[in-house]
Amino acid sequence: MRTVVLTMKASVIEMFLVLLVTGVHSNKETAKKIKRPKFTVPQINCDVKAGKIIDPEFIVKCPAGCQDPKYHVYGTDVYASYSSVCGAAVHSGVLDNSGGKILVRKVAGQSGYKGSYSNGVQSLSLPRWRESFIVLESKPKKGVTYPSALTYSSSKSPAAQAGETTKAYQRPPIPGTTAQPVTLMQLLAVTVAVATPTTLPRPSPSAASTTSIPRPQSVGHRSQEMDLWSTATYTSSQNRPRADPGIQRQDPSGAAFQKPVGADVSLGLVPKEELSTQSLEPVSLGDPNCKIDLSFLIDGSTSIGKRRFRIQKQLLADVAQALDIGPAGPLMGVVQYGDNPATHFNLKTHTNSRDLKTAIEKITQRGGLSNVGRAISFVTKNFFSKANGNRSGAPNVVVVMVDGWPTDKVEEASRLARESGINIFFITIEGAAENEKQYVVEPNFANKAVCRTNGFYSLHVQSWFGLHKTLQPLVKRVCDTDRLACSKTCLNSADIGFVIDGSSSVGTGNFRTVLQFVTNLTKEFEISDTDTRIGAVQYTYEQRLEFGFDKYSSKPDILNAIKRVGYWSGGTSTGAAINFALEQLFKKSKPNKRKLMILITDGRSYDDVRIPAMAAHLKGVITYAIGVAWAAQEELEVIATHPARDHSFFVDEFDNLHQYVPRIIQNICTEFNSQPRN
């Protein structure tokens, strides 16, 4: 009996030493792992939908090829969570079809999602959905920790198939949180439990929670194999270092002695943590009734002084607050000018009013002259680009603030800006006094710069201390998108109907050349259901509507439709074709669209063209007549809008048609831009 007891004591001592060495080694290993692990961006497939991912904000890497139409996207700028994450990224322009990293942020569900065609992806409409998301460039915020492994709402997620997810009862460790080493007293307690031959009753949860020994909160686990309870201890939540204040661990009290099914628990440290991610602060999507891309040109010249510069910044901050900045509404950037202009931040730098106001506060004055014309040229060439966050469906607006008067000319720079579709507003403060007017470089500069001279685009303030009074009228005007006339350009504001001669004299080969000419012209325009629309009619003795203005709303679809037009063959009744186009095409044109008819023929008409052409002119249809080979010059001049020299063209051979594309486009734009600005 004594021998047995000695043997048991020897075994206990041996086990104690093993556990002690193991605990020390574990402590060293734990100390080595305190360093935060390097963030690994999780990869997802093109078909992964945002709604399947539980994380409220995360960075992922998309593969190439997500432009494929089989990956459905719902919405524009703000997407329903039923959408493909990577498909939405391509649609928004954050990614191209080669893939890459993106930042995804969950936002509230919407009452409706509008479909649109953008960057090769056709998004679909959806009446409502419970959750939305926006896609941004993968620039992580300071102090925010993003998950290296995504949490999916289904066990059969793509990550699970790749072996990346954890079991249901496991949780990823909180960055910066480490478990304390097992203490000597705990090891002795376990050792005594092993050595004692009698069976001890299991502690109840209440007994565990009311122990008199002061120690950190603990979570108990039971080993199925050894029928032993081991305790994992953690640092107190008050002393635990945090990488992200937005992520907190739940208080483990009340969770003691949980028994995870199938968990292998070894002696010593058994970590079990519960994560609780605080709901993110609500992110405004912006006012959808004021979806504009706005650039403020602020005066940083030396003459303005520091005090007035601060007043100017205060107006900017107030505008940012009043506009309700967001991806579904207005976006705003700031350019400061002096001798030379410089961008402080572009349209996609700050996508909510709070961040924008903070950034405005940090702007410092540059000094120098007041070269406004140079600044307008800079904005026209550099600011409104896709890389800077410019959106195709949002009007481009520039608000120029001028103290006194510019030190350079603005007329030519402003004309180019208007022709590029930019709506220029001017706020002038404290104009030139009578004895200062001799120094003004360009008299009446504001009217030469603004989009229209009807007073809508100009605001004048007698004193800097009255600048705040411009806030409400300015916000109201820039958000009145129906009156932003300069958003309409020669390339985005027309309904263009091609009337194509398909008579026998043309021939199959030449007919394909004519279609290529139509394609080359179409490529020059901005195509969508709200921009330029294209329709086509083919005629011989009879007429055929190939497609109407409302048939296709994207450039690729239009170009494919032109390719599919089949050669008809027959006689040449040009007059009847004009009447048919007026009835079947232009009768369905939108009231706010310029109506352009481009007629191509290779011979004299069998019927009268004078009365149909006059009807077209009276209905406001601007008609271009292009004759090839045997076309009659006098007929072309009758068909064409006055002056005929700008609207009729004769080409000796079909193969030379392509040479006239630049000239026709130039004439269309010259005529558009010569409209009165009042």
Swiss-Prot record:
Range of residues in the leader sequence: 1-26
Domain of life: Eukaryota
GO terms of molecular function: glycosaminoglycan binding
Biased composition (Polar residues): 154-168, 230-240
SMART domains reported for this sequence: LCCL, VWA
Coiled coil: none
Locations listed in the record: Secreted, Extracellular space, Extracellular matrix
Domain annotation VWFA: ranges: 293-478, 495-668
Positions of the UniProt region annotated as Disordered: 154-177, 199-257
Disulfide bridge map: 46-62, 66-86
Entry keyword annotation includes Signal: yes
Domain spans labelled LCCL: 40-133
GO annotation, biological process: extracellular matrix organization; positive regulation of cell-substrate adhesion; spinal cord development
Glycosylation sites: 390, 520
Keywords in alphabetical order: Disulfide bond, Extracellular matrix, Glycoprotein, Neurogenesis, Repeat, Secreted, Signal
Alphabetical list of PROSITE patterns matching this protein: LCCL (PS50820), VWFA (PS50234)
Secreted recorded as keyword: yes
Low complexity bias spans: 199-216
Function: Promotes matrix assembly and cell adhesiveness. Plays a role in spinal cord formation by regulating the proliferation and differentiation of neural stem cells.
Description of how the protein assembles with itself and partners: Binds dermatan sulfate and chondroitin sulfate.
Protein name according to UniProt: Vitrin
Taxonomic source organism: Homo sapiens (Human)
Encoding gene, per UniProt annotation: VIT
